[in-house]
Amino acid sequence: MMFYGWRIVVVAMLALGLSNGLVSYSYGLLVLPLGTEFGANRMLMMWGLTASSMATVLISPFAGSLMDRRSARVLFSVGAVCLALGMSLIAVSRNVWEFILVFGLLMSVGATLLGPIGANTIVARWFAQRRGRALGITAIGTSLGGLLVPLLLQTLIDAYGWRIACLWMAAIALLLLLPPIWLVVRNRPADLGLQPDGQPGAGQPTGVASLAAGSAPPRLMTDASFWRIALAVG
């Protein structure tokens, strides 16, 4: 019988694909039609992506802490709702600043909770000896999302215009994410009476340590090294 953890991997792939596909890979498809309608140049339109990157830097430490302490199923559901609500609000935005605000806040929260922080954390809990393989398969979701989501969004924009296309993507994200998240995602193998990898007595591999109390977000936010890395990445 297939180990339950592989179901977690499939949901994590889906979460990564849709979140990265909508936020990172599809942004460029919205720049031209929104800029044309709102009379904004491309430099101004790119502020949405800048705001999203800045928000992600600030949100990520807290998202990681929440993943350690709260239900992954609830946090993934919140992320899915944020993505769907964000796309819905973009569809009814009246000016470029509303678009930038929604993209920089709601879409960033959704992508952070459903992205590598959330997906990799939940997958790592379900695997020990096969953790590398499981994480590698999960990462495929990013590439698939980068290929399929922009293709679908562009098709919808060509057929219905960008506003209706965004509403369609909101509905698709909600329908594809919420049911499997709620039905499949569990915090740890122990919740179902299982062990990591599905093996009796399987445990954490040597060298895997828990997050130290001193690395909690409030202290991390004052760490100069953290900000240097964050600025280099984002």
Enumerate the language-model features and the residues they cover.
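Helix-loop-helix hairpin linking two adjacent transmembrane segments in secondary transporters
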Residues: 137-138, 142-190
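Hydrophobic core of transmembrane alpha-helices in multi-pass small-molecule transporters
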Residues: 17, 86, 98-114, 234
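Short hydrophobic/small-residue motifs within alpha-helical transmembrane segments
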Residues: 50-57, 143-145, 233
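Flexible cytoplasmic inter-helical loops of multi-pass small-molecule transporters
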Residues: 185-215
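Extracytoplasmic
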Residues: 7-42, 59-63, 149-150
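Conserved MFS/SLC helix-loop-helix module at the cytosolic interface between two early adjacent transmembrane helices
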Residues: 58-97
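Juxtamembrane cytosolic amphipathic helices that cap and anchor the N-termini
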Residues: 2-11, 214-233
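Cytoplasmic helix-loop-helix junction between adjacent transmembrane helices
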Residues: 103-140
